[in-house]
């Protein structure tokens, strides 16, 4: 039998409205704590990530127990494809605050196969080190109430939950990037690298 992998995030070529419906349906089917991908409306600073996920409010109560376990970064550079960097974080806000530096260090060490890839990696690392608004998604574990509350945050575009029997460590995870409007497809890569 073929090997199958759980996925979180849109498929290449998928219509964005179809993915948004699929993500909403996944949260509606959750009946206990679940792992979920949170994709943002725009690239956020880590401070905005913490605000959008750590003190989630529902009518009449504060929801605790939302745990960010991975922060995903992609530095926006017009008409330049930049790499997606995913940084695992322990369960505390300070680790989330330090995660752009970890992503920057990884980018510099990875470099690239071509001069352009190396230039993109260095430009991305520089912006991450400077605290850019570059977080495009997070992987969280939360209760159904927590996931529903996160869905209503103004910075959140989509929340997609994994099935309860799936492992986030074995799943392919790719956020819905802010620039995906109609269809999930790569943009141009012909712009100058700063």
Report each predicted region and the residues it spans.
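Inhibitory N-terminal propeptides of secreted protease zymogens
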Residues: 1-153, 157-194
């Amino acid at each position: 039998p073929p090997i199958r992998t759980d996925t979180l995030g849109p498929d290449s070529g998928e219509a964005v409205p179809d993915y948004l419906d699929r993500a909403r349906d996944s949260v509606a089917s959750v009946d206990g704590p679940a792992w979920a991908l949170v994709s943002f409306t725009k690239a956020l600073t880590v401070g905005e990530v913490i605000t959008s996920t750590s003190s989630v409010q529902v009518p009449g109560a504060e929801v605790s127990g939302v745990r960010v376990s991975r922060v995903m970064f992609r530095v926006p550079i017009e008409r330049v494809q930049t790499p997606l960097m995913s940084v695992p974080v322990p369960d505390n806000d300070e680790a989330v605050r330090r995660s752009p530096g970890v992503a920057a260090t990884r980018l510099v060490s990875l470099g690239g196969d071509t001069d352009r890839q190396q230039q993109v990696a260095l430009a991305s690392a520089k912006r991450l080190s400077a605290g850019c608004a570059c977080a495009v998604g997070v992987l969280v574990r939360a209760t159904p109430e927590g996931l529903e509350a996160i869905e209503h945050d103004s910075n959140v575009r989509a929340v997609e939950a994994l099935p309860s029997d799936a492992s986030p460590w074995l799943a392919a995870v790719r956020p819905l990037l802010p620039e995906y409007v109609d269809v999930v497809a790569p943009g141009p890569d012909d712009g100058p690298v700063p």
